[in-house]
Amino acid sequence: MIKQPKGELTIQVVAMPADTNPSGYVFGGWLLSQMDIAGGVFCRKVVKGPVVTVAIDSTTFKCPVFVGDTLCCYVSLIKIGKTSITVHIEAWVNREFEEESNIKVTEGKYTYVKVDEDRRPVVIEK
């Protein structure tokens, strides 16, 4: 059975040498940052306004990311609250020259809050 990503493809970015640690693996912080960006892009579209990250509720690292991997972040809606929106984010890599070329590397649950121009929480209209 071929595993498929769940959610909307929100961003794609190639991992570069500057994103790695001395062992040659991409930093977990870089990966979290890309996932956070993807979640923010998705949530801004859903709530029709700016959002800020308030929680990374969970993250599971499944396997490493290497230089040259194309990181693809998929986002799906979990729930919308009064001022917050919670999403599930899956990070997959595309390794073009390997037999298993589409690999889930990380997933997590992120929560964002819609804010106004003064950066205060505002009600999300449903």
Indicate where each model-derived feature is located:
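Extracellular/lumenal ectodomain signal focusing on beta-strand-rich modules
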Residues: 56-58, 107
